[in-house]
Amino acid sequence: MPKETPSKAAADALSDLEIKDSKSNLNKELETLREENRVKSDMLKEKLSKDAENHKAYLKSHQVHRHKLKEMEKEEPLLNEDKERTVLFPIKYHEIWQAYKRAEASFWTAEEIDLSKDIHDWNNRMNENERFFISRVLAFFAASDGIVNENLVENFSTEVQIPEAKSFYGFQIMIENIHSETYSLLIDTYIKDPKESEFLFNAIHTIPEIGEKAEWALRWIQDADALFGERLVAFASIEGVFFSGSFASIFWLKKRGMMPGLTFSNELICRDEGLHTDFACLLFAHLKNKPDPAIVEKIVTEAVEIEQRYFLDALPVALLGMNADLMNQYVEFVADRLLVAFGNKKYYKVENPFDFMENISLAGKTNFFEKRVSDYQKAGVMSKSTKQEAGAFTFNEDF
């Protein structure tokens, strides 16, 4: 065995010392951050308490109309079981079924994301501010997916009775699990310190601003008195408005040629969430009795205020070199599109300020899948479904 030279021993000792110093500094930073967040959390609790009171007061002012709509929900076709319909075919709700087939054709798995090049970028190309920003974005995504899936499993998938919509929600639950796995893998890959990982995985409790988003979401979607239509709007606002700024910030990294694994997974997840948001709008359109447009507007604009505040105070986009005013405008642009989809008028009346988000923002346009030909769809799924519904003759039918 070769004898260790004094210079190598000194170098190893220095390396160990640097690692220990680095860990010590990280622990100090985390403790400082926790203390700052404890102070923020105390202030936020007071704000959330006031927000909850204002929320109840606002809904009380619409009590009579909402009570009538709640009673009328008993007659909603989407929410009432058709005991004579025991099998899926023949399809009754064709638009809803096509939404399911689009989701099915977009299936992917976490194993398809190559993170090997990201490690180099994370350690050598990204600065401390950028690493801080991305780690917090991933923490929010991981926390939000838990809320989304819980709502799907406990509420929407059991409340909606038509088989076409149940098919979509069943698939969405599975794909949200894949999103959750992907976010966890990303955090595990980039964040090597166990204490920091724990801090990020518990973001709802450790990062007050993410906790505020969660509280707002639960206030709307887990309220027993909330109308189904109101909860659809809130759910779409989570996946549409709350995710919009974070998606845009990661696409900004792609524009700079960084983090290919992260940005590719972001493309896939952004596309999925777009389908999920569109589906919420589609179900809303099928409701016979819709919520008051004023309440729809309030839900969406509340989400915008929280999202804009999040990127102003908690996670300044300047850390990535992005313009904060343009980010605010982008969130408003996304919100306007959502309001129009729900039958409301535009509230903000702004243009999309991010050219790199143009094709992503427009429904049906997905030209950013460079790793796959033809929209990353499983071969023939959509074409087969469309032909079957149209009654088209095909040469592979059984005779």
Swiss-Prot record:
Protein localization: Nucleus
Name of the protein in question = Ribonucleoside-diphosphate reductase small chain 1
Determine if 4Fe-4S is one of this entry's keywords.
no
Sorted keywords for this record are: Deoxyribonucleotide synthesis, Iron, Metal-binding, Nucleus, Oxidoreductase, Phosphoprotein
Sites of Phosphoserine modification: 15, 24, 41
Described purpose of this protein according to its UniProt entry: Provides the precursors necessary for DNA synthesis. Catalyzes the biosynthesis of deoxyribonucleotides from the corresponding ribonucleotides. RNR2 provides the diiron-tyrosyl radical center.
According to the record, cofactor stoichiometry and binding are noted as:
Binds 2 iron ions per subunit.
The record's subunit annotation is: Heterotetramer of two large (R1) and two small (R2) subunits. S.cerevisiae has two different R1 subunits (RNR1 and RNR3) and two different R2 subunits (RNR2 and RNR4). The functional form of the small subunits is a RNR2-RNR4 heterodimer, where RNR2 provides the iron-radical center and RNR4 is required for proper folding of RNR2 and assembly with the large subunits. Under normal growth conditions, the active form of the large subunits is a homodimer of the constitutively expressed RNR1.
What does induction of this protein depend on?
Induced by DNA-damage.
Family designation: Belongs to the ribonucleoside diphosphate reductase small chain family.
Q: Which cofactor does it need?
A: Fe cation
The organism of origin for this protein: Saccharomyces cerevisiae (strain ATCC 204508 / S288c)
- Gene3D superfamilies assigned: Ribonucleotide Reductase, subunit A (1.10.620.20)
Q: What is an annotated GO biological process for this record, any one?
A: deoxyribonucleotide biosynthetic process
